[in-house]
Amino acid sequence: MNHKLFCVHFLLLILSVCYIQGQDAGGEPAPAEGVAPAPAEGGAPAPAPAEGEAPAPAEGGAPAPAPAEGAEPAPADGGAPAPAPAEGGAPAPAPAEGGAPAPAPAEGGAPAPAEGGAPAPAPAEGEAPAPAPAEGEAPAPAPAEGEAPAPAEGEAPAPAPAEVEAPAPAPAEGEAPAPAPAEGEAPAPAPAEGEAPAPAPAEGEAPAPAPAPAEGEAPAPAPAEGEAPAPAPAEGEAPAPAPAEGEAPAPAPAEGEAPAPAPAEGEAPAPAPAEGEAPAPAPAEGEAPAPAEGEAPAPAPAEGEAPAPAPAEGGAPSPAEGGAPAAAPAEGGAPAPAPAPVEVGPKTEDCKGDPFKRTDCGYPGITEGQCKAKGCCFDSSIVGVKWCFFPRTARAQCLFSPGDREDCGYSSITPMECMKRGCCFDASITGVKWCFHQK
């Protein structure tokens, strides 16, 4: 088409040159450019052309060539020529009959849409307008509904989904598409069949972060490489406590089983059962826990008796039935000191004296412990004298004849019990009172 137009214009140019040369040879001055030729002598002047029409050709001149099909008409006399369309672009539509020509688009503005075509969508507020296509390029096609727009020149294209990865499922009708994950983050896992998908964050909001740990608690540790992440707690349940440093995490309960209760504060956690053993059943409410391996079980209370209350933390155990209660510590002070142990036997000062004036308090072969248990003195350092003998206080107060003795105890009373009563004790004479006082 362009080749034909070029040939026609070239032929017209040759004819015009030949015509001008012929006029110059005939001696007739050529009319000025843009001026209509003078009418012949005695002839009527040529009518002026209507507005918007091309002027009639001069007599003998070649008529102005009609524009080719699809080409733009020549501009009116004194009018600005219509801008040529970009190479490869569609020509501007001709104005309707009697209508004003379409104004040229402002510099940098989008071209007017073709007749019958939908106008290009206006850019959103704050967005840059779509760039005009370069000369010789076709305009970029509008993206299909639901597809991402093509990247601008100089920008990196959106990354294609990795090979082996499944494409993201298309959102259901009426739902917003899932946001693309940030660079370096793993895509969110697809919900299991039958489960509701996680709600997408509102536009302009950051994705919901993981729940922060309670005040004073350590954050949940990240799972080690190759381990599965800890399951999220059910709605309304407290998260499982993180294991102490160096301890193994508690095993997850089997499917259908209830998780093991967390130990109370200050208690040791229950030991995990050995591999292959069944876990010990939890004690019923109100029952005592089972004893640890190697410990003796606590004696069960007799039927009808109330179980003994456990002592308070740091408190002293309650006394046995029938025993004397322990002395309570003084108010606000340190606990009362324990009573000094009662020294068995007389004091050392009571055992001094003339060895040859000792009164026998025992029998041949009596041991030191047996002698002191009777409240007597024992001294085996001197040979030939009494080793077990009465102390001086006993000689002064308890050397009574058997007929002067008054019973002060009971059968099989010990020397300690007798001395606590303030009585004398003498078991050296058989058949008389051993614990006595003077009549």
Swiss-Prot record:
Biological role: May act as a growth factor in the germinal layer of the epidermis. May also be involved in growth of regenerating glands and in protection of the skin from the external environment.
Domain of life the protein comes from: Eukaryota
Any GO molecular function: growth factor activity
Intrachain disulfide bonds: C351-C377, C361-C376, C371-C388, C398-C424, C408-C423, C418-C435
Location (main, coarse): secreted
Stored InterPro entries: P_trefoil_chordata, P_trefoil_CS, P_trefoil_dom, P_trefoil_dom_sf
Gene that this sequence comes from: p2
Classification of source organism: Eukaryota, Metazoa, Chordata, Craniata, Vertebrata
GO cellular component, one term: extracellular space
Region (33 X approximate repeats of G-G(0,1)-[EV](0,1)-A-P-[A-P](1,3)-A-E): 26-343
Species this protein is from: Xenopus laevis
Record's compositionally biased regions (Low complexity): 26-345
Name this protein carries in UniProt: Skin secretory protein xP2
Region (Disordered): 25-351
Keyword annotations: Disulfide bond, Growth factor, Repeat, Secreted, Signal
Sequence repeats: 26-33, 34-41, 42-51, 52-59, 60-69, 70-77, 78-87, 88-97, 98-107, 108-115, 116-125, 126-135, 136-145, 146-153, 154-163, 164-173, 174-183, 184-193, 194-203, 204-215, 216-225, 226-235, 236-245, 246-255, 256-265, 266-275, 276-285, 286-293, 294-303, 304-313, 314-321, 322-331, 332-343
Expression tissues: Skin.
Domain P-type per the UniProt entry, residue ranges: 349-392, 396-439
Signal peptide: 1-22
Location within or outside the cell: Secreted
GO terms classed as biological process: maintenance of gastrointestinal epithelium
